[in-house]
């Protein structure tokens, strides 16, 4: 019987078809800054409140995150630019209209973008089916208007979704979803029409979960990012792996932390066999070269 949820087949990594990245790279590395905007007075949502500490407005928490767009983003860019990193931004689309300077800096660097919703204070799980359809139309149109780019993927706003989300994403023309943090390689996701894959994101190599939620120091973040890379680099000699580092400008962009991002990137980018890329390009390459084989292989196991 299929394992719930019946969206992905179980296929152990030890006997899958081998993946070869471009130029025989061992690791496809993508960096995902979460460039977000939180509403000062968000709509009341009985399922979840973005500011549980006090009644709205919570100036402390709002302004803490706003630091990222005012200061941290720019400090983070300096580090990323030193290593010629081309990012795939997890983007609250409202940023494109609220902060044109940030928009222009990202466009100038030819970054790719995945939707992270409109605001990080609006969640998908309260949406009706038609509201969710309109949400995808809105995010696709907004990105195209401001960057000229076609939206290809999504990390749900605050990693939220509905049971319909994969089907509606594919229906709208999206090809990848990063909410599924279940693998070190892309994996096909079953949808009613089209093709959709999970591209490995990370809650482990994520400054939000480590530095904010669990209060680890920046040197620990650097240490585990380098250790993760070293292990994936070793395994990638046999079959390509994906590594994502998830950043939040209001966290990694703090003065006392930014040196650790330099430490991480210096270590990784000193290696040959690293495909520094974006989630868009990983999804495109995987679907073109490995999607059909992966589906056929999983079918034999089920």
Model regions: which residues?
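Catalytic alpha-helical scaffold of carbohydrate-active enzymes acting on polysaccharides/glycoconjugates
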Residues: 2-197, 222-245, 251-302
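Positively charged, amphipathic and often flexible ligand-engagement surfaces
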Residues: 186, 198-220, 240
